[in-house]
Amino acid sequence: QSSFHSWG
């Protein structure tokens, strides 16, 4: 299980 978050 993996989670990815990106803020620009």
UniProtKB/Swiss-Prot annotation:
Its main location: secreted. The modification Pyrrolidone carboxylic acid is found at Q1. The modification Glycine amide is found at G8. It comes from the Eukaryota. The keyword Secreted applies. Keywords: Amidation, Neuropeptide, Pyrrolidone carboxylic acid, Secreted. It is found in: Secreted. One of its GO terms (cellular component) is extracellular region. One of its GO terms (biological process) is neuropeptide signaling pathway. This cephalomyotropic peptide stimulates contractile activity of cockroach protodeum (hindgut). This is Leucokinin-6.
